[in-house]
Amino acid sequence: MLTIHAAPLVLPAGADPGLDGPVVDGAVAVDGDRITAVGSYDEVAEGAPGARVRRWPGVLTPGLRQWHPLWLLRHCYHPDPREADELGEQPLWGERLAALGDLTETRWSGSVRRGVQRMLRHGTTAVAAPGARFRDPVVATAVARSGLTVVGTTGAPGTLLGERPDLDPFAEGYDLAGTVNGPLTVGGRADLAVFDVPDESALRERGAATCVATVLAGRLVYRGR
């Protein structure tokens, strides 16, 4: 179904003329898993009569790239909501992870699935792995089922010993162009993220925890309450 995603500000993060800067009252048209138009809402809507319209607050950007998925999924434990009273809601790592003892594969599998969902809630649509594939079968299965794009690690930042990678891709300190997996382009895969902030500066300051929607290959896979 043809869908228009509209927002007060669209940040295409592209280099093509007309897509190299912010678009006020912008929109992205999506048909299936592909982007069919990017521009002002009026222009996009004119070219897509009858399309369903989803209006979002804040800024709409390309989906983000997470450089450290394996660390986050296999070296952090993501508590089940039923464990929140005992373990809290944030990922456990280091000494707190060790205190859990040996976890069964079933429990690890649940943690990995929840970790993937947490990435989606941070606007992530692509994850990096050496050779663009995961050798850990639990991680590989969870990522494949989610629909996340797997990319290579060329250009990935290093992680200091003892430093915990963050679910927020902006924690690496890059600007938007350096944090997204690729720009919004007509004909490209419809991987989008929406953040409830007024502009790119606020997005970099407040981070991906402000995400209110994630679209993966045209599918709305996360919507904040």
What label would you give each PLM region?
Residues 1-47, 168-205, 215-225:
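N-terminal metal-binding scaffold of metallo-dependent hydrolase/deaminase domains
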Residues 80-94, 102, 151-167:
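Long, charge-dense
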Residues 121-161:
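Active-site loop-helix segments enriched in His/Asp/Glu that coordinate
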Residues 118, 142, 186:
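Hydrophobic/aromatic ligand-binding patch that stacks against planar heteroaromatic rings
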Residues 95-111:
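Active-site mouth loops of central-metabolism enzymes
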Residues 114:
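Phosphate/adenylate-binding glycine loop and adjacent helical scaffold
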